[in-house]
Regions:
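Acidic/His-enriched low-complexity segments
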Residues: 1-234
Length: 234
């Protein structure tokens, strides 16, 4: 028998190029995304913090993410220290490059990794808010739903629309694992394209937190969310 080859994401190859992303994955790429978000139906926005694990090459001092209409309020390192960032000019149909200075301090290499196995070198946190006109998010009023009592939200990230509500490297070749905690007003339920982690947890302000996890690296456009008067049946 032959050992099954490990296939790396296409954009780790120098020959591959995606002209619909601002990212430079040969220098620094996102490997994991941890979202802590609050859903606001009145403002038609999702906002909070995206914590990104980054694998950077030796000598790389910045990472470029994709954004489209995101309102970036702060970027910090793991210790909460501010990091320099710049939101570039908008390119029609593509959005803006979000360039972030990487922390000087690198993450410790986890114990038990095999020789040659790669691990994240940096961790950064981006505080942000999506715009009401975010193309990936469809906000429906109660009158637009079958029940007529509660609003409804669903996302459509393909092909490059998730950058309108998630600051990451929005390219199908830059696959990422992810996890998310999403706060929504009662009695709405939240679903995502990941594995549910426990029951919803009640929090202040008549809201509940929902948790999800995806341990298999996926293209960013496959991160999906919906919320509304959703029922679960066996």
């Amino acid at each position: 028998t032959t050992e099954r080859a490990k296939i790396a994401p296409i954009l780790t190859s120098e020959q591959a190029f995606d002209d619909q992303t601002f990212a430079k994955p040969q220098e620094a790429r996102v490997t994991h995304l941890d979202l802590d978000l609050v859903m606001d139906f009145d403002a038609k926005s999702i906002g909070g913090t995206a914590i990104l694990d980054v694998l950077a090459t030796e000598g790389a001092n910045e990472i470029v993410l994709d954004s489209n209409g995101l309102r970036i309020s702060a970027v910090t390192d793991e210790a909460g220290n501010a990091l320099e960032f710049n939101l570039g000019e908008t390119v029609e149909g593509k959005g803006e490059p979000l360039t972030i200075q990487l922390p000087a301090q690198k993450l410790e290499r986890p114990a038990g990794l095999a020789e040659g196995e790669l691990a994240a070198t940096h961790r950064i946190a981006v505080e942000y808010l999506s715009a009401p006109e975010a193309e990936a998010l469809q906000w429906l009023s109660p009158e637009q739903t079958a029940g007529g009592e509660h609003p409804f939200l669903f996302s459509q990230g393909q092909a490059i629309n998730n950058r309108t509500w998630i600051p990451t490297q929005d390219s199908p070749g830059i696959r990422q694992t992810w996890e998310a905690t999403v706060s929504a007003p009662e009695p709405l339920n939240v679903v995502m394209s990941g594995v549910v982690q426990g029951d919803p947890e009640a929090v202040d302000g008549n809201r509940r937190d929902f948790r999800f996890e995806m341990n298999h690296p996926v293209p960013p456009y496959l991160i999906a969310i919906a919320a509304g008067n959703i029922e679960f049946r066996e």
